[in-house]
Every structure is written in structure tokens, then in C-alpha cells.
Curated annotation (Swiss-Prot):
It comes from Parabacteroides distasonis (strain ATCC 8503 / DSM 20701 / CIP 104284 / JCM 5825 / NCTC 11152). Substrate binds at N15, N66, G76, N77, N152, N185, E203, R204, G213, T214. Pathway: Amino-acid biosynthesis; L-lysine biosynthesis via DAP pathway; DL-2,6-diaminopimelate from LL-2,6-diaminopimelate: step 1/1. It holds the Pfam family DAP_epimerase. Homodimer. Catalyzes the stereoinversion of LL-2,6-diaminopimelate (L,L-DAP) to meso-diaminopimelate (meso-DAP), a precursor of L-lysine and an essential component of the bacterial peptidoglycan. InterPro entries: DAP_epimerase_AS, DAP_epimerase_DapF. This is Diaminopimelate epimerase. The active site is at C75, C212. One of its GO terms (biological process) is lysine biosynthetic process via diaminopimelate. The gene is dapF. GO terms for molecular function: diaminopimelate epimerase activity.
Length: 269
């Protein structure tokens, strides 16, 4: 027996996911659906599937499934999109929303103009800084990376010229290094100015994506601990910029950016 599920495709800085309100449309096989729906030619096309649900400890819950069906701990871009979704769908009237994720509760501050959410700031919590100058080998090259956790793992590598990075070939090798038994996200970063960097990302479970919110946060933290950037930095990704601030007093990382509704519809399962 088939049923129709309503979905909304949204993106944050080009990082696009399929969003489903599971309070209205329950889903019991998200891994399979994420794989099928993420395919651009035979599905909807996305970086994965995000389920919005109820929560006993926050306003809403978020579960993220990558394009390969694996479940992600956290996604900053998806968090911003959920902030826009729940407000504009009438699920909340608050401009400050709490979101339960696998990496803890996140607070979203919504900027609202004419009943539309134009910008969302996410309290991403405190980062965990691992090895600051880890040498790794991939594809016959030696890279020096900084290990950062934003609730999910990141390897941040600073380079002089972004255009010389073969992300499609080296990304999957670095993702699956034995040093990272659960695999890792990989960011290559070129410093443009003390408060501006360019970043490209290979996401664990999804490959090359237009943007990664937690990756932008990890990039900003790595820039500070490596003495390369200021605490407030614009991170420019293929899908657009995010403003990241690592607050010195609280130790928390704050991410600010937009969220966009692309289209919505029904799909049969």
C-alpha cells in the first residue's frame, strides 16, 4: 500500500536537504528513503533527508540522514532551515527555538521580517579541539590538518591555493583514514584575509557539497587556534557565505546565515 508524504526541499548556503514534518507524516525507513530521494535523476535530488519531529526536551527534534543513508550527528545548515520551516509553517510563533539533535540541544535565534525568516543564528555550542597539526597521507601527498569536533568530526587543512586541491580524489581518502574509525568530514581552507576565508568541503557520507555549517564552524575554530584568523570570520563556500563567531567569553561558536525554500510537493512511498 502506497502513501503520499509531503516534503519541502530547502538549502542553506547551497547545502540542500529534503525536509519532512514527521509529526504529520511519519517515516519508518529514513535510511532507504534518503538514499532513494537524494538521487538527482531518479529521486528529488539532495544531500540527504532531514526529519523534523517532536521532543520532550526541546521545541523540536532533528534527525539527519546523508545521501548514503548514514545518520549524521549534526548539521548547521539544516538547523537554520528548520528554524525557517517551523516558523513559516505555523508550528511555532517564537523567534527563539530549541532543537534536539544527536549532538545536544541547539538554540536558534530567528530574524523575522514581514512574517518571513530572513536569517538564523545557531548556538553551535563549544568545540572540542584535537590535534592541532596532524600530518596525514593521502594519494601520495602529505597534508597537515587540525582536528575539530562540532558534535561531529572534522579535519581542517589550510592550503595556499584552493584551485590546486583535487577534492574529488583526495576527499574520500581522507574521510576514511584509519585514524578516524567513524570517518571524518574534510575541509580545505584558503585564508583570504584575517576575517575571511574560502572553504571547500568533503562531507562524510555525502561527498562534495556546496556548504557545510559545522564545517564552517570547525574552519573558524581551526583558524583561531592556528593563529590564522580572527574570532569572527566570514567563511565563503561554493554555495555562499556564513558568518562564524567563536565567542571568547562563553567559548561557544555562533553561526549566522540564511535559509531558502526551493520547492515542495508530495512523493509516494
Amino acid at each position: 500500500m502506497t502513501k503520499s508524504i509531503r516534503f519541502t526541499k530547502m538549502h542553506g548556503a547551497g547545502n540542500d536537504y529534503i525536509y519532512v514534518n514527521t509529526m504529520a507524516y511519519p517515516i519508518d525507513n529514513p535510511e532507504e528513503l534518503s538514499i532513494a530521494w537524494s538521487k538527482p535523476h531518479t529521486g528529488i535530488g539532495s544531500d540527504g533527508l532531514v526529519l523534523i519531529g517532536s521532543s520532550d526536551i526541546a521545541d523540536f527534534s532533528m534527525h539527519i540522514y546523508n545521501a548514503d543513508g548514514s545518520e549524521a550527528m549534526m548539521c548547521g545548515n539544516a538547523s537554520r532551515c528548520i528554524g525557517k520551516y517551523v516558523y513559516e509553517a505555523g508550528l511555532t510563533q517564537k523567534n527563539k527555538v530549541t532543537l534536539e539533535t544527536l549532538s545536544g540541544i541547539k538554540e536558534l535565534q530567528l530574524k523575522i521580517e514581514r512574517e518571513e525568516v530572513t536569517e538564523v543564528t545557531v548556538d553551535m555550542g563549544m568545540p572540542a579541539v584535537g590535534e592541532m597539526a596532524l600530518e596525514v597521507e593521502a594519494g601520495g601527498e602529505i597534508y597537515t590538518g587540525t582536528v575539530i569536533s562540532m558534535g561531529n568530526p572534522h579535519l581542517v587543512i589550510f592550503v595556499d591555493e584552493m584551485d590546486q586541491v583535487g577534492l574529488a580524489s583526495v576527499g574520500p581518502l581522507l574521510e576514511c583514514l584509519p585514524l578516524f574509525p567513524d570517518r571524518t568530514n574534510v575541509e580545505f581552507v584558503q585564508v583570504l584575509k584575517p576575517d575571511e576565508v574560502r572553504m571547500r568541503v568533503w562531507e562524510r557520507g555525502s561527498g562534495i557539497t556546496q556548504a557545510c555549517g559545522t564545517g564552517a564552524c570547525a574552519t573558524a575554530v581551526a583558524g583561531v587556534v592556528r593563529g590564522k584568523t580572527k574570532r569572527k570570520t566570514k567563511v565563503i563556500m561554493d554555495g555562499g557565505p556564513l558568518t562564524i563567531e567563536w565567542d571568547e567569553r562563553s567559548g561557544k561558536v555562533f553561526m549566522t546565515g540564511g535559509a531558502v525554500n526551493v520547492f515542495e510537493g508530495f512523493i509516494k512511498v
